[in-house]
Amino acid sequence: MKKHRLQAKPLNLRSRLSALALGLAAAGMLAAAGAMAAEVKTIEPGKLTIGLNGDMPMTQIKDGQLSGTDGELMAYVAKKLGLEPNPKQMDWAAEIESTKQGKLDIMHGAMGWLESRTKIMILSEPIYYFGTLLAQKQDTNYHSFADMKGRKVGTVNGFTLVPELKTVDGIGEVKLYDTSDGVMQDLLAGRIDMAILDPPLMQYAISQHPEWKLKQIPVDPEPAKYPVMSTKYNVIFGINKNEPELAEAVNAAIKDIWKECLNVKTMAKYGLSDKAWFIPPEKNPRIEVDRDATYKAPTADHCF
């Protein structure tokens, strides 16, 4: 029996040139990623050591990978920089301290911009924005700072608003917790009257557990007395102060996130599709602190 050998058809010149172009493009992308990784200094070469507290829907480690609204964007940034994500889970206060001490390259998880934080780490461009909301039982209607008078308010130790919350006129007690779970448990048990948690987390919890009969209401702003809690936060990544090249590369990746609407798409996956998440504060507190007077915060108008 005669054996038949399969023979590839010869490529014409155009096909050869196209294949060569594709090969060069792929090689170029790999080289660019490699060059970026080589230029960026990190604690462990070739890896991005990332702090997170595991609060969903913002971030968690699932099957060894980062997931969640912020986590998936962080994974995108690492890939863009040609670095392998090296996530480390810890409580919020430990995240801040570890970044400050240079034990983490970067931290994330609905992290709000705060002027005091600019003194201990480099704060990235925002990935989205949110304001202060009061989480409470459905049968209450707390919506103002006056409503905190004589009442117990719970939040997480290390959150942006803690120093200001303690100054609210007549507030009954500010109860601080190491984790959001602790706050939530006491709110459900009636041991605190209201809670201030990351709005994405609360919105996700409310949608997943309607039987808890919780809601969250925006606080009536009083910017003259309580500027931090009366404005929208820039949600950012916190970067090791000793890694300015990393910060520059991270900001370049975040610029692409806004351009490609990746933050809008990722938030929508977790039920956070309202345009308000992508509208910056009218008066940006970063101006003349870590951004100059010409700074324009990114928006996602082109994504809607």
Task: For every predicted segment, state its role.
Residues 163-175, 216-218, 248-296, 302-303:
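Ligand-binding clefts/hinges and TM-proximal coupling segments of bilobed small-molecule sensing domains
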Residues 36-65, 141, 146-150, 291-304:
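Immediate post-signal peptide segment of exported/extracytoplasmic ligand-binding proteins
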Residues 83, 91, 111-113, 124-171:
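A conserved helix-loop-strand patch within extracytoplasmic ligand-binding domains
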Residues 38-111:
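Extracytoplasmic small-molecule ligand-binding "clamshell" domains
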Residues 94-97, 109-119, 164-167, 193-231, ...:
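A ligand-binding cleft/hinge motif common to bilobed small-molecule-binding domains
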Residues 71-80, 146-147, 151-152, 159, ...:
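Extended ligand-binding regions for polar small-molecule ligands
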Residues 71, 87-97, 140, 175-189:
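Short helix-initiation/N-cap motifs at beta->coil->alpha
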Residues 54, 128-136, 210-251, 274-294:
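Periplasmic-binding protein-like
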